[in-house]
Amino acid sequence: MKGKTGNSQSGFTLVELMISVTLGLIITSSMVQVYQSNNKLQTYNYALSNIQQDGRYIISALRQSLMMVGMYNEFSANLDRSVDVEIEGRFIKDHPVVLEADFALEPTLGSKEGTGSNPDSLVINMMDVDSCTGSNFDFADGSEFHTVNEYFLDETTLRCRGHDGRFLRGLKPNGASGQSVALLENVHNFQVLYGISQPTAGVETGAVTSWISADRLVAFVNADGSLPVVGIKLAMLIKNDDDIVIENTRSLKMLGHDKFTPSDDGLYRVFETVIVFRNVWHEVTAGG
């Protein structure tokens, strides 16, 4: 009589099963870590791209606006001639940067140095068809006139307020403007240094001989009342507004101030530029 032969089946032992589960958890954990790392890197790169775009935009916009500081062409066919254009031209060329008390109707209007590390403000004179807000202050469309633009930081928004220079000089009955436009948000500091040109060995070259803050400008006003500012340095501290947390260990530095580390975990970058006032440089070197 033949005996029965059974088919025996073997499975995972408990030890093998535990090893498999452990390896699976390790692989899954590694994949999650890689995913999180890639996700953080992608978020960081996106935030960095946005802040770089904001920085390039505002630098380009300010350079385009401020390059013409001190410009006045009394021979322009579009210049409004309801005032003495020779006197107006001399005023703008001698005062490219506005200081406090330059305008009797608004004596507090002027470029200011912020206390401590607080933001600065910049006020300039030029000839244009409108102010930085787009207003032409009831001049005919396309007419050029004395424009005063004031750049300042309102909390974390860089703004510009336009003024009618002829009104400020008492030559018009109206023209005051309290309106301002936002140039860029998420700006946490705005610093300005002014390039002063003084003669070297008795020769005026138009080169910057010193960079100073706004509170020292008065000391460099010439005997004839002119201010030899031929350029400016601008610095802006911009923060990205994306929801990103970064441990800040990188020190930053603004113009004329000590290094600092941001107090929160946002992404910050400092953007700087130098702008030469070509028209003022010509006035200084040519002697008017």
Which residue ranges define each predicted feature?
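Charge-rich, low-complexity intrinsically disordered segments
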Residues: 272-288
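Active-site scaffold segments
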Residues: 233-236, 272-274
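Aliphatic-rich helix starts adjacent to a transmembrane/signal segment
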Residues: 2-71, 286
